[in-house]
Amino acid sequence: MSTTYRSTEKDRHAREAYLQLAAAADEFEKYANPHAVRIAAIADKIAEAFHMAPQDRKSLRTAARMHDLGEVAMEREYIQRAGSLTDEERTDLERHPVIGEQEAARASADRDVQLLVRWHHEWWNGSGYPDALRQNEIPLAARILRVADSYAALTDARPFRPALTEEDARASIVERAGIEFDPAVVKVLLSLQDLEELRSYAKPVDPSDSTATVDDGWNLFSLFMR
């Protein structure tokens, strides 16, 4: 068996596993669309604008699919309900990026992917968690993931709340630029013209079907692997 074939088979099994993990997270969080896949698409668009290296973009897409594995592993009912969290619940929830990092390691994700999962709730002003990183201490990919995750969360419906319009979601992101989000990443997000179209990107697919496509013509696996 050739090295190339073994590598291709390994990649295929990895992407199937990662997509299944993403589907499990989406089901647990009860998003109307496959949320993690949509985050990956938005994050990749932003990363492309920053001329991020192909391998770094691949790691970012993988981390986007795995970012909330910690919430799934914790299995807390408060994650799925409307309303504010108690102080105890919020402290508990803030453990999920570290648990997600551990779950990503168990899934044999690369170390850079594990760290992006760990840092996807770090804030530009240093008030995020778990490590209170600030500004450029946070890797660019993690800053991109923070914005993409937030935008997708605002514009994806859940059983206890409707989705925001694109206009309202953008306004919410702008309001938090320089606080939660890197202003440079927000600027790129606002420059993207096809964010609404990416809703059609987030549709259920069979992870074993390498020919599966989405409405805008992207191939799910070519996006994941390139």
Task: Enumerate the language-model features and the residues they cover.
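Histidine- and acidic-residue-rich, metal-dependent catalytic cores
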Residues: 2-226
